[in-house]
Every structure is written in structure tokens, then in C-alpha cells.
Amino acid sequence: MSSSQTQHDEIDLKHNRPKAGEIRRFATGESVFLSPLPVPTGQPPIDLGGSFLEVNDVYLDVGSSNQGKSYQARLCVMMPMFMIIVCLIVAPVLAGFGTFFNPFGRTFWYYFSDFFVFGLWCSLWTGGAAALIGIYAVVSTTRAKARTRPIRFNRQRREVCYFPDGSDKPVIQPWEDTVAWVSVSTGFTGVGVMSTYTFGMAIDDPVGDKVHFLRQGVPTPLHGLAKWEAIRTYMEKGPDFCPGQATHEGSHTFDKEREDMREEYQHKERSILGVGWWYLSHVVTWWRFPYWVAAWDQRYSMKSMPDSIADWSKPLPPEQWATQSPALKQQSADLEKAFAQGQDFMTYFKANLSEAKAEESQNA
């Protein structure tokens, strides 16, 4: 999730604190709030993008895993390799076919060697440039992730801990005061109206007089509800009822993908051409190398939490566990009753993020 400290008009936490079910409109869209008072959403809990980094009886860490890093590394290897293959093999071979159309009796190898020398220099420049772009993409994204620590949700204390970028000083606030929302923004693309959906959280820092905003793009509002429901389910019910810890990528990922490919071939779900393409594509992208890059990303970016919250993260005796507020219990019971009667979160609060703002944008 991306973070920001900018105060936005649609989420005025200082002068007009929102509550669950409230809808606020802004210039290009609207937001429906899921908390304060984190009530049930009625959606199945889903961990979008593998963000549950640690799940245990005391706390949940939500951040960015290295899922997708091996694919990014493969793309970054494929770009220079594509340039090299085109310049050193494809172009000289095509030039060599010119022997069939020339009246001077020049051989295939005459044209091939002539273009090969040119392709060698071309591949050095284009392949080198593509390699530099790929290295920058891989390293910069890993370094950016390493600067951001995960958000820690302590279910026994019913508190949330957030570390601003570059700081070892925690910002801790009560769980029931955490602001969460799903928003839609609409705009014109020249041929129609396009909507983008965002799941967000806000952590209030009264000591620093700041509000830290955290955002993640989601495919639909229901995905945002499901992401929040996964966090809420952990805090209210425990680790046995929410998604488990996200898996990380490494050499074992390559082994599993190869084993899956072989099983697909054995069960007639993949052709011999598909098997050949799998091996060819992985040879071109340097076999296990992208998965070693993913393992490096995991080691470099997944730093341990500072000692400043070591005591805060220790388990408490059950008699010291914080409990739900009466207001949350009542509102949760009301929502559960509405769900049993066939309503969902959006209809209960009369929120429709996908239609209202689209009509307003078209009228504008």
C-alpha cells in the first residue's frame, strides 16, 4: 500500500471524523467508510496481493510481499535478451536469405556475417540500455519496499502500529478509531467514463499533528470490502478465521512451477509444444536467476521491526486482553441481522459507488 501524509478534503479527520457507513463526496468521486467502528462487511475475507506477512495469535503484519518479483525479474531479463536475439540471430538470418534474390552469387554466410557484425554493436547498445532499465526497475522497487515497514495490528491490545517512512518511532492508535474506506474516482478518457477504485486507511498521529494515508488500488469496491474484512476478521475473531501468511517467492517457486507444468502435461492439460515453450522461455530468461532475484528481494526488503515495539508485540494474559466497545457490539449485531435478511453492506448504508458518480460525471 502506498503511503502519504497529505491531508485530503474528503477525509477531514481533525474537524469532521467519519464513521462506518458514512458516504462523502469529493470532486471526482465519493468514498464509503468502513471504520471507525470496524463493523462486518458481509464479504469473505481476502488477502489481496499477498499482503499478510505475519499472522499469529498476537499480531498481524500487513505490507508488501515479494509475490510477482520473479515475474518482474523475468521481464527485465527478457528485454535485453530479446534485443540480443533479434540483432545477432534474427536480423542476420533474414539478411542471409537475400542470397536467393541477388544476381552476384553471394552466399548466405556473406550476408549473415556482414549483418552479424552490425548486429553485434546494435545488441551491445540496445541490450545494454534495456538491461540498465531493467536493473533500475528491480532495484528501485525493492529499495522503495524496504523503506516501508508493514502495519501491525495487535488483536490482544486492539491497537494498530504504523511506522512512517524512514522512522523507527511508532504511531499507535486504537483499533476501533482506525479510519478505513473504499472510494471511486471517475473521469473522462475521451471515449467514455472510466472509474478507478481504491481501498484506503488513515492513521492519526496526534503527537506529530499528521494523518498518514495508506492506499491500494482494487478491481472493484467488493474487493476493497473483502480486504478490510480480512483484517477485521483477524482482529475480531482471530488467526483461524482469516487468510494465512502469504507465501514468498524463491527457488522453490521455480521448482513448483516446473512440477505443475509436468503434471499438466501428464494430465493432457498442456501440449508438447507448451512444454517446449516453457523450457525455451525459461532458458531465455536465465532459468533460476529471476527466482534468485526474488529471494534477494525477500531478504533485503523484509526487515525486522524496531525494538521500540518489542514489548508492545508480546502476548498478554487473557484477562488483560482489550474487548469490544458496546457501540461496536451493537452496530455489528444490527449489521449481522441485516445480512441475515438478505441485505449487503452497500444496500444497508444506501451506498452505490459504481453508478452515482458516473452519472454526475456524464452530466458535467
For the regions a protein language model found, what residue spans apply to each?
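Alpha-helical transmembrane spans
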Residues: 65-147, 264-364
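N-terminal topogenic membrane-targeting module
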Residues: 140-168
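Short, mixed charged/polar active-site loops
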Residues: 150, 168-172, 208-213
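Phosphoinositide-dependent membrane-docking surfaces
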Residues: 159-160, 168-188
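A membrane-cytosol interface segment of integral membrane proteins
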Residues: 179-252
